[in-house]
Amino acid sequence: MNNFMAKVAAINDVINTFVWVKIGIVLLLGAGLVMTVCTRFFQVSFIGHWFKQTLGSLLKKDSEATRKTDKKSISAFQSLCTALAATVGTGNIAGVSAAIVIGGPGAVLWMWVAAFLGMMTKYSEIVLGMFYRRRNADGEWSGGSMYFLRDGLGKKRGLKTVSAVLAVLFALFAILASFGIGNMGQVNKITLNLQSAFFKNVSAELLGVPAVNLVIGLVLMVLTALIVIGGLQRIASFAEKVVPVMAILYIIGGIVIVCMNITAVGDVFASIFKFAFGIKAVAGGAAGVAIAQVITQGCKRGMFSNEAGLGSSVMVHASANTKEPVKQGMWGIFEVFFDTIVVCTMTALVVLCSGFIDLSTGLPAVANLNDATLISQIFGQAFGFVGEAFIAIAMFLFAFTTVVGWSQYGTKAVEYLFGTTGVKVYKVIFVLMIMSGAVMTSSLAWDISDTFNGLMMIPNLIGVVALCPLVAKITKNYIAREIKGEKIEPMVSYNPEEK
């Protein structure tokens, strides 16, 4: 078993290095910059408008954002919560901790940069996903990168075959990613944190595997099956109730920790900018961190968290009953803002003001720092067992909702490749894979997730950038109609019957 895992790790390392170090970061930041310029910095130019259309709309009675129009679709708010269920996961806690431990405080700045540019990548993905969506055999909306790759990019001269191949590759990588970022990586963090908080003294093993891991894996399999079998409606209903509560409670807990260390906040922000371009080696001690490592960690963990560039959440946003692609796209901007600028930043502040990171050197102040349980240690240091238990429960909710949300992404990818008949088989495999995450080593589960992220990102961003003129045209059309009040024909679908 150990030899097999070693071979898997070696193969994954080769692919991961190529995808992320060679091309991934450049492609991710480059695409975000292109779409930001293409939409004329929409996330800044119309910041008041998209806040009003998203967060502001939730304050209205009988808002369009929370209203469902039919049994086969979900509301815009439900689509946001389902997307946030998939994005607000272990990446917001363990992922940010890992970025800081490996890349230093400066990784936080690059996480922000990736989020700023990622807002428009996410927006563009959703706009295209909404524009090229269609009803499936069961009457449900189906949309995603595979559809705009095939039907959008495929309309360009000489690209029909290439676009069809890219669409299939995206769907295939999405299925694999659903087992990585959406399953094994999340379950692994749940297991580690529950062990750390509640089962420190349990050492029983079964077949060479800790019995606690097997029990946790089994319980998670049952819980996931109960929700996933109910399809999108049950997933959306679950997400709508759980996501807002879990996020608010975690933010409140983070604010309390930061307030307890309020005198360190100034030094925290100073260290973020000071070490954004690398960390010099300490004389007679620890090695430094190269700028490439800082940027890579910040961007990688940022994208792992908000998933801008993956094209993943498009598959659930496209199920919303909203007609306007731009209106749903603005929920994507808010999704990245809330996930990274709010939740991930809160985690970063908690880690950096805790004393576990030396703000004068940018390096860990404690030897052999475990990023997987770092936040748990910090809360435990402040509140004892209650703090550790709080983070274990928060991690469970964050990660479990991600598993549930990603099951829907994988479902839509399977539907594209094999039709609705293949969905049941996929759901069974997805539930069974949970056990692998419970018994796998932390680093390997995380590395495999990184690799699948990158592979999924490549065809998606090729399609987004290639269709940049269409995104700009749809955005310009919306601004003219909804903001400037011009009476022109709306651009809401490639299919005339859906207009």
Spans of features found by a protein language model:
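N-terminal alpha-helical transmembrane segments of multi-pass membrane transport
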Residues: M1-T90, I100-A107, G118, C259, ...
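Transmembrane helix-loop junctions in multi-pass membrane proteins
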Residues: K7-V8, C38-Q43, G91-V96, S178-T191, ...
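Alpha-helical membrane segments and immediately flanking helix-loop junctions
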Residues: D62-I100, F131-L153, L169-I175, G288-F337
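Extracellular/periplasmic helix-exit of transmembrane alpha-helices
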Residues: Y123-R133, I255-S271, I279-A286, S319-A320, ...
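Selective recognition of specific alpha-helical transmembrane segments in multi-pass small-molecule
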Residues: L117-E125, G217-L232, V243-T263, T296, ...
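Membrane-interface loop-to-helix entry segments
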Residues: L27-K52, L166, M184-L194, V212-F273, ...
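Flexible loop linkers connecting adjacent transmembrane helices
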Residues: F42-I74, A98-V108, W112, M120-T161, ...
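Helix-loop-helix module between adjacent transmembrane segments
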Residues: V34-T36, A114-G139, R150-N188, S196-I227, ...
